[in-house]
Amino acid sequence: MAEADPGLPTQAIWDIPFESLEFNEKIGKGSFGSVFRGCYLGLDVAIKKIEKADDPEYLKYIDREVSMLQSLRHPFIVNFSGICVHSSGLYIVTEFVSGGDVRQLLKKTPPIGWDKRVSIAVDLAKAMVFLHAKKIIHRDLKSKNILLDEFQRIRLCDFGFARMSEQTKKSRHMTMCGTEGWVAPEILLGMSYDTSCDVFSYGVVLAELITGRKPGVDLWVRSPETCFDINPEELKQKSIPGCPSELISVCVECCLYEPLTRPKFDEILSQLKVCQNNLKVATAAAAAAAAAAAAAAAVVSTPTIQTPIIQTPNISFSPNNSNNNNNNNNNISNISPDITTGIQQINLSSSGGSNNSSPSTPPQGSQLVSLAQSRRNTMSLHRKSMELNLVDGQLSTTPPPTSPIQSRPHKPSDSIWKIAAKPKHVGYQTLKRKQGPCYAALTSHITKMIERATSDYYYDTSYIQDFLLAYRCFAPPQQIFELLLSRYIANSPDNFTNDINGWKKVQRVIQLRVIIFFKRWIDYYPQDFLEEAMEDNLNEFDKISAQQNSSTALLLGTTISNNELLIDPKLMTELQKKRSELELLIQINSPSDFINNNNNNNNNPVNNINNINNNNSVNSSSSNNNNNNNNNNSNNNNNNNNNNNNNNNNNNGLNIINIAAANQSKMMLQNGNNRYSVLVTSNGIGNGEEPYPVSIIPPPTTSEYLDVKDIHSTELARQITIINSFYFNRIKAREFIEYIWEKCGEESTTTPYVGTSFVEVVPAENIHKFVRKCNNLARFVSTEILKQTKLQKRVATIERFIEAAEKCLANNDYAAVFSIVEPLVDQSIERLSDTWRNVSQRNLATFEHLKSIVSKENDHKKYRELLPDAKPPCIPNIHLLLDELSFIETSSPRLLPGGIVNFFHYRQLSRKILQSQQLQSHCFRPIPSIQKVLTKPPSELFDDELIKNNSLKCEPPVSL
């Protein structure tokens, strides 16, 4: 065997042996661990030791950071050297950057000049252009994560929160992360977000460079009352003298409230390059003017004569202007306003009063200011369309204030609620439910949520679904209706004052969004309109919308066509139509009633087939006997068919009985043992226009119930799935919220909904029924196995359940898989060694595969990997789903301090609920004789004590 080349590494390219690392002084500490200066292969490196290397939640972020750094190579991104796994911990090794970070640089005295500040902004924009081109969102952009080398060139680091932005509909993320003070408002409000959140954080970094202040402490202290919006006027007031106006404009653009109005990093970079060039020109002009002034002063020979007073360009700042000094405003007010124009000016004052100034600002700067102004003028109505105030408990609309400062009230710096008030770096990932004061949801925040749901430029259907599912937890229906009505009749905001036609076009889009919102509301949750005065409100809205449409037609009749006008929504008609549909569903019989009715009228499989197919019968007798019976009893068959039609009409809600009337051909297909009859339909269709599969009819039995071993495994799995599908599809989405309220809610609350209470209504009724059905199926499996006293019958029963579980897995009925396999791995059945020894090898191999799926290892990892790829219809494990929802409920608060709605919490619940509810029925034909076996009364099933005793009877323990 050839020897390995000694010049090649013997380990993986990114693996670093612990012995090769040299640790020096500790240079920092972050949310995931400590950072040391060290040495690797003679090079200075930074070594990050992970404190919680055994925590799977932390390791997820560490693995993400490592994978990101491995794939990134850029001059302004920290270079990754490798990773070291050792018994003492986990270590990430990167290049050592010796210049500290930008936050430390801004604290230095004397402060850095504007050329260096703009250079940092340009370099950071280049790095972000690179990241976004690779579809990477950093999500934790801040000055502490921007390192500086010895030449004060940046290195972007800390990719623990970074994510890939997939090019799909799911590209808008919802995970709440980032650092308080820099995080975008849409993240704080629990809304979906994309790469624009990095643009906002970048704008906050620019604000640090402009003011030298720390966000959330002495700059932009955001509060829930303003929905975490920022005040751009505060930036201009606190900016350091000499700041280029273009830089302020870029910063304000980046920090716009609406994500879609923020610029891309390509645009930001081009604007900053213009600003950088203008600054170089101004600096060169100022230096030339200063040199000329110095030469002129040297010519003057008489010192007693007043000489011109030379004021040098203010490129660097006085040491008295400390970055964190709270008296900066007083210092700034005493400086000439000419310094803040972005062009350094020199005033030469003499007795004659002559002045020489620097060249004027190039036209590119004014164009940028105009560009920023035009972008702000085209902002959506999300911010300014209406200001809703709660006066004496009544909701009223007021015109927007004229002063931009008054329109964004801010709390003082000593306020109880303050972004960045808590030192935790992990931020909103660590929010926990704690005992504390109860808050009422802030009306201004709910208003913002309504504006987002009815936005004229961005329409997010998932946001509307999540809002409608969860809003009852923080607002009554009447309040939501009033906010929607105010949104519908909103007056023209100040940025459309001179463009009434433009405003009317935007208003039509908003009104259309409001109408669509109402229709979705009626379609998804018509029961909400049973609340007091809600029907009257809908009638009133129909009248208002009709008047609005008439006014719009009169005002814009000459500029728009008739087909562009809004159609009267007639919401009350929509509600009545929906209620008519619900009244039909209320008449549905329960599945047990259906089965009992059929079983009372039919005591053999032949009649069961007649009840199902509304046609002729098929049984296991000879074809001649069948023909004779059909001819002699045609009248009876017709009567049976009529009865069956009535039964099916009464049970059409079961989604499993709606069989289309079609010509059906019958044939007898027998397996090797001549035991099963097979029904084949030529034109029969099931739900979704899919053909029903071939039904396998079990042989007749003289006893009350069929024996499980006599039922074909495929048909057994189908009948189990039919029952599970019926119970699961009856669960309403809000029942999950009711269930977790029952399990995790506070004792002081009588309902999870605001303004309502449960009166003669059982919360989460259908969930409890489905849970009981799954538990009864598990008891049924144990009962059917342990009631068999003979070994071969027990073996046949176990093999039948294993085969049925495999078929249920193919049907994506995970609830049935868990209900069947979990009893088989229980000690009472697993101990039956003689029985398991006779099970076939194929079934044993299948059973091992099923055990791996239901295994609790790594928090049901195998099951969680299969579930996202399952195509509907799919029935999840209800127990695990409820546990996940309960964990979300207890892991974060519903309301944040100040009354802000933690909509991220509700969106997590909603996404999990709606993704699990793939409300499609399986296309299987019911066999009542089999369903009768599967729906035995609970009193006929073994309890835990009987299961244990019968297990000992089947195979008594061997005494040693």
From Swiss-Prot:
InterPro entries (UniProt xref): Actin_reg-Ser/Thr_kinase (IPR050940), Kinase-like_dom_sf (IPR011009), Prot_kinase_dom (IPR000719), Protein_kinase_ATP_BS (IPR017441), Ras-like_Gua-exchang_fac_N (IPR000651), Ras_GEF_dom_sf (IPR023578), RASGEF_cat_dom (IPR001895), RASGEF_cat_dom_sf (IPR036964)
Active site: 140
A GO-annotated cellular component: pseudopodium
Keywords: ATP-binding, Guanine-nucleotide releasing factor, Kinase, Nucleotide-binding, Serine/threonine-protein kinase, Transferase
UniProt keyword Kinase, yes or no: yes
Binding site for ATP: 27-35, 48
Domain Ras-GEF residues, every copy: 712-957
Domain Protein kinase positions: 21-274
Keyword ATP-binding (UniProt): yes
PROSITE patterns named in the record: PROTEIN_KINASE_ATP, PROTEIN_KINASE_DOM, PROTEIN_KINASE_ST, RASGEF_CAT, RASGEF_NTER
Similarity comment text for this entry: Belongs to the protein kinase superfamily. TKL Ser/Thr protein kinase family.
Name this protein carries in UniProt: RasGEF domain-containing serine/threonine-protein kinase X
Protein source organism: Dictyostelium discoideum (Social amoeba)
